[in-house]
Amino acid sequence: MAYSYTEKKRIRKDFSKLPHVMDVPYLLAIQLDSYREFLQAGATKDQFRDIGLHAAFKSVFPIISYSGNAALEYVGYRLGEPAFDVKECVLRGVTFAVPLRVKVRLIIFDKESSNKAIKDIKEQEVYMGEIPLMTENGTFIINGTERVIVSQLHRSPGVFFDHDRGKTHSSGKLLYSARIIPYRGSWLDFEFDPKDAVFVRIDRRRKLPASVLLRALNYSTEEILDAFYDTNVFHVKGETLALELVPQRLRGEIATFDIKDDSGKVIVEQGRRITARHINQLDKSGIKELEMPMDYVLGRTVAKAIVHPATGEIIAECNTELTVDVMAKIVKAQVVRFETLYTNDIDCGPFISDTLKIDSTTNQLEALVEIYRMMRPGEPPTKDAAETLFNNLFFAAERYDLSAVGRMKFNRRIGRTEIEGSGVLSREDIVAVLKTLVDIRNGKGIVDDIDHLGNRRVRCVGEMAENQFRVGLVRVERAVKERLSMAESEGLMPQDLINAKPVAAAVKEFFGSSQLSQFMDQNNPLSEITHKRRVSALGPGGLTRERAGFEVRDVHPTHYGRVCPIETPEGPNIGLINSLAAYARTNQYGFLESPYRVVKDGEVTDEIVFLSAIEEADHVIAQASAKLDGRKLVDELVAVRHLNEFTVKAPEDVTLMDVSPKQVVSVAASLIPFLEHDDANRALMGSNMQRQAVPTLRSDKPLVGTGMERNVARDSGVCVVARRGGVIDSVDASRIVVRVRDDEVETGEAGVDIYNLTKYTRSNQNTCINQRPLVRKGDVVARGDIMADGPSTDMGELALGQNMRVAFMPWNGYNFEDSILLSERVVQEDRFTTIHIQELTCVSRDTKLGPEEITADIPNVGEAALNKLDEAGIVYVGAEVGPGDILVGKVTPKGETQLTPEEKLLRAIFGEKASDVKDTSLRVPTGTKGTVIDVQVFIRDGVERDSRALAIEKMQLDEIRKDLNEEFRIVEGATFERLRSALVGATAEGGAGLKKGVVITDEILDGLEHGQWFKLRMAEDALNEQLEKAQAYLSDRRQLLDDKFEDKKRKLQQGDDLAPGVLKIVKVYLAIKRRIQPGDKMAGRHGNKGVVSVIMPVEDMPHDANGTPVDIVLNPLGVPSRMNVGQILETHLGLAAKGLGEKINLMLEEQRKVAELRKFLHEIYNEIGGRQENLDDLSDQEVLDLANNLRKGVPMATPVFDGAKEREIKAMLKLADLPESGQMQLFDGRTGNAFERTTTVGYMYMLKLNHLVDDKMHARSTGSYSLVTQQPLGGKAQFGGQRFGEMEVWALEAYGAAYTLQEMLTVKSDDVNGRTKMYKNIVDGDHRMEAGMPESFNVLIKEIRSLGIDIDLETE
């Protein structure tokens, strides 16, 4: 395989055995594809597909006025250009969005003409607000913050059949129900009650008999019975009856008389139960009719009304029971035949017939009125109102929509073949659902599993945005309808009709404050990717935490390859928030699909298909690890999944095979090496804690990884990836300039790519985003190569933590209960030092008393406090500041107070103005120490710009100019290179001071200035033309870049759009360096977390026989009970990786030959299991580069479920000349004595989590108090106190510490007078206290009084 630029510099030894079938797809595709479909940005009018914005417009337009004389039609839309790019939006705190312009057509019809002749047509583009754009990394910038819209897993529209699991009725009887869920509109439920009648509910209101709905659909009683039942036909023959025989229907009944064939032979004796054998005999005997006594039909139900043949009088109504009287009438009236319903107790219950009997309505109108009364109780029903209401419920496209998904699911469930159809319900649909429900009650068919992923679908960003947009449009529609009637009379234009505010508001609300629009978790690249791939069952139209039961949260067999069974939060959201599996994607209906290889006759093919949970059920699917010989499945029985069960089958039966063992898990879980050896609960913690790792100062790749690290780093967007191949022209810390290869440059494009690197920027979680170049000048890069590392990446691989030398042993109780003992060397080498960036904001407002002013002239502040401020009152970049230091000086006007005569005199003499203003400067918060790394000033239009703002603006303009000049320099250089190759050797006609007939040489060209080249006149016309073209191209380019510069300059110089009343905003960015210290939380990747308890001097740490001390000591007791043995295997393999690195280091120091290096590398990569690496393709220099990068250890990849085996780990340890047990004798650093047994020592990848003691430590002496109770507030953010709670009070009571308790409950808490007195006393040096009445006691008394109880405290 060909290695990319970074891969060949550091090849990972890969232990995977299974063939590589398919690359992991682009990890952010779910977000980007969905939003791209929503916007359809590049599409022309004819290319628009019926999805996204286009579909939303088409569903609401055309809008027709109430009179029908005017209509507003939708023609198309276009998106403008964003005003600012992403970085500017973040800086200015605005939304990254584009204006949406919709072309609409207003048509006015002629009132007079009968056939609607068109009187007037006006077409116009209307502005419909701003639509947020997605950045290329799948996020949105809303008001300057990066947000992610999480996909939602909700119940798919369609029809679902279920039962109550016997919980409703005390008898435990199963009550079946059916529910039709539309995409939007009213829900329709059918349900059985304990007496087996069928009821209907609309939108969960009170229930009505189901027959009411059928009558409202204009079915008569006979039609209803006809639809649901077969009939038995009886012929009346004097005193007996003859039944038209259908033998199957007799099965299971008890014969009440002898059943004989035509010859008189008895087939079934009286009193015997009729069995399948009897039915066969009846079939053979060919009996068509069966004679029976009259009383056989008593109690049966009439299927069609029985009518007197002579008079036409109705003898028995349809759906009534036959009694002795009725039979007598039938005989008397000489009725020849009648029909009864065929029902029995086994598989054909009389449910619908019984329901009709309790139904009080008799015709359509009564049924409609009944439904109207249920939906609108208290309103008087009229025929029209009832009809309109019923029609609008399920049969009007604007109120009800099943959607394409819903229709497909509906038709599949009720057994139709076609998957397309109308979005509204029909009479037939409702009857079909009832039939299916009755069949299920009769024992035919099964209920649905609502947790099956075939019944839950994913709503992505695009779809949710479209829904919100439609909501906005519907609001607009109402307003437009009313204005349309005026449009004809007043000659209005479309612009005057449409008010875009509701649309803009709906979109803004969705992106800004929807439950699924979340502040992006930006701790590290993994947390970003995971957040974008998250699937939540919560949110609007989803579940709520409280109502979600155990079943919804549990892992379902259909999750396999679609949703990760491991990664989900702990706590109340467990199982409701999931993560997409590595290979999963959504199909056009929104169902999750997983890829499989097609297997035919036991042979695996190269064809890969994506299947949803519905399509997969009938397949027999082998695991990715099934043994293959070439392409044939070898084993006699293969472990497979079939019908959502795990079983074994013969190879011939297998139809599909997994593409990779890691398709089961999510990205985060697939980064845990030896995941297969960890308990699931700990793996869950491991995948969650990787997301909390803080990017360290120097990223360090994991020695033991899984091979997924490269994918995550590349797809997360934190690295700089080459857009086009080429040569590095120049590179420094802040940008990379690439001269693009000629064959990748489109005509008219610049042959240069400039990549500006992000330097020391704040992330959402206050961690530091910084990019470092990996390339050198002159390097050749291809498209897709990684050119610069971002936070937590090392040479294009994800690097969340550091490789630490660990020993598993107890050490003087310092690692009791998961504590961690660290070596001081870790601190000295800055292994876990992180940079955090805080943004502090100072806002200058216009107050009632006058504007606040940002200035260095602050009253009552000494010179020392101002020495870090410039003349504008803003701190210098680079200043080191500590708690309480002034960052931005600001004064606020103070209200005029009544002055005493003395003060007036003093002010008259000295002109003292200081008392007019108070100091409201921005100061560094307590407990924060750092360096100012950036200052931004935003000024409202019309306010004068101060010196600092002008300096910042000049600096930014210089940067932009430098970029554009660089771009022009390269374009110019490339153009002249092309000209040089064309001109050298050609003949000149003159110009530029040359004589006619001179042959151009390199020397001549070097002697001319570039501008002079264009003055050359050549003998060949083609060359002259080329010179002209080149000159025109360069002047165009220069013009283009100048325009670009002017545009940027204009943007910089225009005032900022600040909130009302705000004059100026100053943002100061502080970089805070945090070393690891006791109290910080650390973790491995296997859920093994702990808190640093102590940092020991290096000389006291345990060390091996060579004197190498360990970095970290972990407690071995943390492993067995937690069953995360993966960490031990990682430690062993890490030791081998490090040992091999040391051997390579030794070879390089001894300056061995390259051939020896090659041989050793070949042993490592190709002789101990796993994937073979093609080292022969590398040049000697590349082998040396590779070896240099392997000095600190050979990185290994052990993919999940396909990783290194025990024998391979041992072989690696042997190759590194280390003990195969992975254990060694350690010595106590303090005494030098050997420990009593050998210890497991190795290298583990440790993370520092974003739970730092600096953020949690907090102390208060005095501070703010709560308004009502007068007790101190709580929490660090409020600068609150520590709660002395109920149990703590008991403790002091138990000790009898009465005085301590008294001050806790009074002066230290809420005795207002007592605490002020106490403060005074302390100031005066008097340390006595008097306790008064706590304020909370007064609150209690007031509460009791509010209940109407008069309570008073009496003093004795």
UniProtKB/Swiss-Prot annotation:
Keywords: DNA-directed RNA polymerase, Nucleotidyltransferase, Transcription, Transferase
Cross-referenced Pfam families: RNA_pol_Rpb2_1 (PF04563), RNA_pol_Rpb2_2 (PF04561), RNA_pol_Rpb2_3 (PF04565), RNA_pol_Rpb2_45 (PF10385), RNA_pol_Rpb2_6 (PF00562), RNA_pol_Rpb2_7 (PF04560)
GO cellular component: DNA-directed RNA polymerase complex
Residue ranges of the TM segments: none
EC number assigned by the record: 2.7.7.6
PROSITE patterns: RNA_POL_BETA (PS01166)
Record field: catalytic activity: RNA(n) + a ribonucleoside 5'-triphosphate = RNA(n+1) + diphosphate
Keyword Hydrolase included in the entry's annotation: no
GO molecular function: DNA binding; DNA-directed RNA polymerase activity; ribonucleoside binding
EC category name: transferase
Function: DNA-dependent RNA polymerase catalyzes the transcription of DNA into RNA using the four ribonucleoside triphosphates as substrates.
Family: Belongs to the RNA polymerase beta chain family.
Quaternary structure annotation from Swiss-Prot or TrEMBL: The RNAP catalytic core consists of 2 alpha, 1 beta, 1 beta' and 1 omega subunit. When a sigma factor is associated with the core the holoenzyme is formed, which can initiate transcription.
Alphabetized NCBIfam families for the sequence: PRK00405.1, rpoB
Protein name: DNA-directed RNA polymerase subunit beta
Species assigned in the record: Stutzerimonas stutzeri (strain A1501) (Pseudomonas stutzeri)
Taxonomic placement: Bacteria, Pseudomonadati, Pseudomonadota, Gammaproteobacteria, Pseudomonadales
